[in-house]
């Protein structure tokens, strides 16, 4: 709930409370808005009451203080999750009950005036408007003697508040009987939980400003009340009782001792805000503790061994989770997912890397984990990784491929550069052999590797001595003979003569003497 909602709800609650004030003729909405403005600006109960008392003389200071206290308690109830409708309904019930009990209160005041003739004679000149302020100071001293039988039904309600009442503030405004608040842990905790907070009253009394005698312990000092303030003065607030809260005159609260052990401890989800005690220390009165086993707000060593073991195990689990959390923050998560550098423009359907959600091409992948819906994800704010979008739709590539060049028209002419040509798209034939093709210029094979005549005149003309030259030469060119050529190299092989003429005399070979060495070996043996 935002601050504006708190303010609007508080205006409605304060206006409902002002509607219950008798003979209040001012604009209720305007006054409620002014009170809420004072509270929002940091005003306390005392400062707000002083401001209202200076503006509205027809309303008693106690009534204004009750309205301001109700506003503070309503604000705290709203912060604790109470609905504004519930608070308004309770205020309406209290207003209706207060109107019904107004006649009874007047009769009681008349009886009190009749039983106090001496006090009435001693103060004949007092104004009627000051009488409600002086009665709370005079009645506590004479109440045991003058009112022994009055209000027998309200004594059980006032008994729990008597230890907190001072000698000058013992008589309080009668409040309607309301049912006690139901604990959220009924049936779980043995003892009923008291109010969670105990108020600390640091403000002066509204009925007396600096007046009255100052006692021995009233001046500022060790053990006394500083500044003459009475810290024992309390004020009952019906709204606080109806909402299960402590009704006091200030909003400064300090935690008090909680009664009743929480049965959910050490696994209680409320933690420190639990209205019941969480035992963490050893009982000082053990083994003479009067409370039954399992109900004391502190630990008993021999009785709560299982609880101590459970507490230790819970503490170890908490420390382990804390250490794991710190380690996870320090160490980056290793998920094995690598983001695609092309992102939503990736045109590879089988790309193994991560891509943004298909519902938003401008999204970024922040969580390095795969999305469960993958390509069917419809969340435009999804921060997980997905497969390539080219699987479900056509993605235009970032750069289009260059068109292939048109095919080169081949020519049957011979390239004059031969094997030294550097043009990769040369359209002429290139000979790899210096031997002239047997077909010559009539060869039609585009991939022929033999030489072919070149339609260009040789620059050496008739004097060209290169027998493998493919250029055109004028008539009269004389080719040199090949070095080392046989004299009859131009004669066909079938006409070549044999090595010996036909009439040559062939002599027999001399006899062989290969056995002489064998004979010498036998003689030596």
UniProtKB/Swiss-Prot annotation:
PTM notes: Methylated by HMT1.
Superkingdom in the source lineage: Eukaryota
Primary localization class, coarse: nucleus
Residues that bear Phosphothreonine: 254
tRNA-binding is among the record's keywords: no
GO annotation terms (biological process): negative regulation of nuclear-transcribed mRNA catabolic process, deadenylation-dependent decay; poly(A)+ mRNA export from nucleus; positive regulation of transcription by RNA polymerase III; regulation of mRNA stability; spliceosome-depend formation of circular RNA
A GO MF term: ribonuclease P RNA binding
Region PY-NLS nuclear localization signal, annotated ranges: 209-239
Stretch list, region Disordered: 102-160, 196-236, 503-525
InterPro entries documented for this protein: Nab2/ZC3H14 (IPR040366), Nab2/ZC3H14_N_sf (IPR043094), Nab2_N (IPR021083), Nab2_Znf4 (IPR049017), Nab2p_Zf1 (IPR041044), Znf-CCCH_2-like_3 (IPR048410)
Region (10 X 4 AA tandem repeats of Q-Q-Q-P): 121-156
Modified residues (Omega-N-methylarginine): 209, 222
UniProt key word Transcription regulation: no
General remark: Present with 9670 molecules/cell in log phase SD medium.
Protein name: Nuclear polyadenylated RNA-binding protein NAB2
Organism classification: Eukaryota, Fungi, Dikarya, Ascomycota, Saccharomycotina
The encoding gene: NAB2
